[in-house]
C-alpha cells in the first residue's frame, strides 16, 4: 500500500450511524477512512503540475495494490489446491506397500480440499463487501477482471490473516487476547478511571490495529477510540467482522489446514474455529469508534491530539523505530500516556533494499527517555504468543516488554 496522509480525526462524535450502539445490525457501521493526501503549496504552476502528476501516480499505484490484494483473496483456493495436489502426487509415488500402510491419507487430503473450498467462500464474501468500504475513497472497478496467480508473499500474508481471526475474534484466541490486550486495557482503566474521567472525551489511538479487537474492546468501555491499520489484508477482514458480522459464531474458518508439519493428529489440521465470539455491533449507544487506513506516521501529524496511544506488537513493524517514537511524542497531549506491549521481531530485518534499524530494548528505552517521556510502568517478561496454534507440536513464545510512559505536562 502506498503511504497516505489524512488529518487526525476530530474529537467530536462520529456522524450518526458511524459509531457502535444498540439497535438493528444493519444500522450500525464502523467508519473506515482512507488516508488523504494534503494539498501542496502552490509554489509555481510547474511545481503544482509536478505535484499533481506525483499524486496521480501514487493514486494509480495504490489502486493497483488494492486490486492486487483482492486478487490474492480470490486466488487462495487455486493456490491451496495446487499445494494439496502436490502432496497427493508425492504420496502416490511411494511404493504400493507403503501406501497401504496409510489407508486414510488420501481421505484426509479430500477433507482438506473441502476446508479449502469453505475458506475460499468466506474470503470471497469478505472481498465482495470491501469495494466501497471507505467512506472517503473509491478504487474504481477491476480493469482486468480475471483471477491471476498471486505471489508467494501475498499468499503467506493471506494465510497469516486467517490466523488473525483466531487471535482477535474466536473463543480459541481468548487466552492470547488476555495475555496481550488485557494488560493494556488495565493500564487504560487505571489511568483514566470513569470516576474521574468522562471516557467519551478520552481519545485513544491504536496503531497497527489488525482485525480491530483491541480497539473494539477499548470502545466497549466507552472511550473514544480509533484504530489505524496499513495492510489491506487486515482492513478487508476487519471491515467484514466489524460491519457485517452480528450473529455470534455464525462463520467458521479452517486456519490450520496450511500447516502440514507438527500435527499430533490428522484431525488437528482440519479443525475449525468460529467467529465472531462476540457481537461486534454490541458497542454502547453513542460510541465513538472508527478505523483509518494508511501509514501511521503520515496520517497522524497534528500535535497534542491524543490522550493515550496503545501499541501492541507494533513498534517492531517500523523501518526506524525512532520515527515511531517521534510521531508518538508529537501527537500525544501533554500529560498523555503511551502504553506498549510486544517483542522486537523487526519486520524488515534482512530484507534487501529495505531500511531496517534494529534497536535493543535498552536502546529504545534510552531514546524514549531522551525525548522526555517519564516511565511509570515497566515489565520486561510478559509471556505471550501470537496467532498460536494451540494444538501444534511447535509453538513460539515471546517475552514481551510492557511499559507505560507519560509525556510531561
From Swiss-Prot:
GO molecular function annotation: carnosine N-methyltransferase activity; protein homodimerization activity; S-adenosylmethionine-dependent methyltransferase activity
Consequence of changing residue 386 to F/W: Reduces N-methyltransferase activity
pH influence on activity: Optimum pH is 7.0-7.5.
SUPFAM superfamilies xrefs: S-adenosyl-L-methionine-dependent methyltransferases
Region Disordered: start-end pairs: 1-25
InterPro entries, alphabetized: CARME (IPR012901), SAM-dependent_MTases_sf (IPR029063)
Keywords: Cytoplasm, Methyltransferase, Nucleus, S-adenosyl-L-methionine, Transferase
Effect in UniProt of substituting residue 396 to D: Impairs N-methyltransferase activity
Known catalytic reactions: carnosine + S-adenosyl-L-methionine = anserine + S-adenosyl-L-homocysteine + H(+)
EC number(s) recorded for this UniProt protein: 2.1.1.22
Temperature dependency: Optimum temperature is 50 degrees Celsius.
Disulfide pairings: none
Consequence of changing residue 313 to A: Impairs N-methyltransferase activity
GO cellular component, one term: nucleus
Effect of residue 347 to A/F: Impairs binding to S-adenosyl-L-methionine. Significantly reduces N-methyltransferase activity
Keyword Cell membrane among UniProt keywords: no
Assembly notes: Homodimer. Each monomer accommodates one molecule of carnosine in its active pocket (residues 313-398), precisely anchoring the histidine imidazole ring such that only N1 is exposed and deprotonated for methylation.
Function: N-methyltransferase that catalyzes the formation of anserine (beta-alanyl-N(Pi)-methyl-L-histidine) from carnosine. Anserine, a methylated derivative of carnosine (beta-alanyl-L-histidine), is an abundant constituent of vertebrate skeletal muscles. Also methylates other L-histidine-containing di- and tripeptides such as Gly-Gly-His, Gly-His and homocarnosine (GABA-His).
Family statement: Belongs to the carnosine N-methyltransferase family.
Free-text note regarding domains: The Gly-Xaa-Gly-Xaa-Gly (GXGXG) motif binds the adenosyl part of S-adenosyl-L-methionine.
Name of the protein: Carnosine N-methyltransferase
Organism from which the protein derives: Homo sapiens (Human)
Taxonomic placement: Eukaryota, Metazoa, Chordata, Craniata, Vertebrata
